[in-house]
Amino acid sequence: QNDTKRTSWYLSRRFGREDDIEVINFMNGGKSRSEIIQSGEKSRPQSNTWNPFAFSTEAFTAETMQSMLPQNVQGGEWQSRAIAMNKALVFGTKFWCVREGKTMSLQMLREHMTLEGMAKLYCRGLDDQWPEEAIAPLRNYLQDVPGFDMSLVRTPSAWTEEPRKQHAYLSGQFSETFTTFAETFGDVFAADAGDIDIRDSIHSDRILIVMIPALDTSAHTTSALGRMFVTQQSMLLARDLGYRLEGTDAQTLEVKKYKGSFPYICILDEVGAYYTDRIAVEATQVRSLEFSLIMTAQDQERIEGQTSATNTATLMQNAGTKFAGRIVSDDKTARTVKNAAGEEARARMGSLQRHDGVMGESWVDGNQITIQMESKIDVQDLIRLNAGEFFTVFQGDVVPSASVYIPDSEKSCDSDPVVINRYISVEA
């Protein structure tokens, strides 16, 4: 819902930080792209622009594209071969961009993904005398395509149907996502450097909001958008882990360059819609990087639908603090919360004794008391929670909690319109 970004802007303005607000908005309110094109509307998009490949290395780009592939589907062999094709495509395209001083983009990768495009890129490398390390991935892939004759690489009209069909099986793994991204969200994905540099957003403590639609796109598209952002984020954090061993701390320890008084907070809302195993890996590493990861989900089952129960359990174990809100049944989510809270010894009276008197009978406590181990959180306690109420589980203690309520009147202002921070491109 668009009030999330608007509320964040007003609250940021209250603290003088509205200039730090950045937004990647994939929501379009169900508007028809065809109607917008036909009407000739030239208004600026309700979003900053983003090129996830502008400053990425080959590994970053390949991993980001791999995250677009559907998960938990049949045809794993085709996906493995598609990943190999993707790495050859990315390496060749990236080297060409570096050599020619161009900016790699989603649209450029899509153009080169065809068999003709990869063959043309290979021929360009031969003509321009690229280094062997740069041209080898393209040559190795083309040689591995069944039915492809390297002697005919410059004459596509002489190719047989078999290599085209084999390559189409591989590129087809990416075609649905690429088509959706380029056509539906083409105004967000920039062909140049774009407005948003996620590494700058993290290291400069900016407030970056990513808005992903849930109702007007397929579950796969929603998941692919979320996984792409998470992959970009995790690969950028990987840089901060460092790799240099020789030199002083100032030269080698990347994370100390950006260390502040407080960790950078990243909130992944409805994480079950785009969960990837990279999130579990992030949870094991972020503490050493001055990075705080907050994940929210309606239920555990949706996360397990994207991965295995084992990976979900690993994620839960790496979540140092857990917040449990209202639930509706005693399912896996409730059991996970109960296990996290642990048990405590409680005294229970075993019986009541009846005493007959002049005025009638009465009941008094019995003489036996039993000590039983019971969960610190009862399912009924979770079911009876109201809006804004939750339990905090921290270091084995269960703390009844309530969120801070901010009235709507203090979260907006009719006389002060929201403005997206637009940036001016400057040639380096």
Locations of the language-model features?
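Short hydrophobic alpha-helical runs that function as membrane-insertion/retention elements
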Residues: 1, 21-25, 292-297, 322-326, ...
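P-loop NTPase motor domains
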Residues: 1-291, 380-386, 390-400, 411, ...
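Hydrophobic packing residues within well-ordered alpha-helices of enzyme cores
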Residues: 7-11, 303, 337
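P-loop NTPase motor core of the ASCE superfamily
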Residues: 73-81, 197-198, 281-284, 304-428
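Conserved H-loop
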Residues: 298-302
